[in-house]
Amino acid sequence: SGRGVFVARSEVRFRDILDGLSNTIMGGEISTDLGDRDVRNRMNENVGTTEIQNNPIACRDDIDPERPRNWLSTVNLRSLDSEGRGFRWANGNGNFTSINTILPPNSELCVRFGPTGFGVLPPSSQHQGGCHVLMADGAVVFVTDSIEAGDSTNGTVIRGGTGNRAPGSKSPFGLWGALGTKASKETIEEQLNQ
């Protein structure tokens, strides 16, 4: 729904970030795909369009309970090396370079229509317990995996949505979701860079 700083085919200026430059995430780390079925960098696209919009954790059942950082070996994952997370740094398609603040850092990648599609694209890193994000004011902040992220089973904000899913509404994904919106009147009191 174009709630973040970077929106395809749109021009956004600092003056458009009404939630405040220090309250808005501009970018974040992404862990590069190593070919090891890691949920943070190997996209799972075994999900339907409405599934992922209505339930951002729709891919969670495909996570290996014995190795919770990996997809089950029975899950069919795209294996083209050229389509790995972070492999095409200048490509604007979500899987390659984008993040969103739906699920907390280091959560699973769940997409529809492969690397050129849309989905849940949390930032990720090899750091223990979190990742770095770039705030719109230029500050770099380490955000923990345990950041308050609201109800991860709540549907996402979408064009034509109603209630807490309507464009312009506050994020249903708690503090984490609020940090990802630029103009939803979601200012925060917490100090992030301490």
Label for each model-derived stretch:
Residues 1-194:
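Hydrophobic alpha-helical interface faces used for helix-helix packing
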